[in-house]
Amino acid sequence: YKRQEYGLRQEGQIIINNLCAYIRSPFDLAFRYDELSQDKPSPHGSYRENHQEFSVHRAELLAEAKVRQRALQEIHRRLRHFPQGDRRSYVEGSWSGFEYDFSNSVFFYPVDMKDSWYQNSVDFSGCTYYASAEFSGSTYERSVYFCDSTYYDWVFFNNSTYFGEAQWSGSTYHDSARFSWSVYYGEVSFHDSVYGGSVFFDQSLYYDAASFYSSIYRGETGFDGSLYRGSVFVSDSV
């Protein structure tokens, strides 16, 4: 029975790996998201003299975005379960026990991973988000990596619990970022980051070391009401 269970688990991990590999795979038009997400070509953009190519490329981008977003949705809905249909509380889902590697993905569509429960390690390092990203209300039992990423739209990590190491270091936020009402049991790093919009870390609890050093804050910033049980590093920040 255990061997059968192990075999099923291996099969499940292969399915997850394939879905993640597809989401990670390069798509050339993704880097033209700013232009192609508009209804018509920009007068100063690369399609200003070729409206037909704009229409073709826009349709391609939207179609690919739809497929990738659907793949992410299929993962997301299996990362939590609502007992008795109660949307206010959730438990782990049927796919919560697998490892997830989304590293270096380019998300040219909104990312909605809120209320997810991960029992294994998760890697979102080196990612680029052209649209909004929602990770609020999530539980991470092991390590999670969001480091070296770029967010062009808003991103929310509110009301989450991290039992292992959590990394956001080396990231750039062009819009607002939220990390409020969260609990960190392991080491957490936000150092060497740039916050172009407002950012809030308030009402959070840190049990281990927290690193915020060498960062730049260009918008409104909040650390109110947080409790730090471990060391805090905040030097060389402006």
Can you annotate each of these PLM segments?
Residues 3-238:
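N-terminal leader/targeting and pre-domain segments
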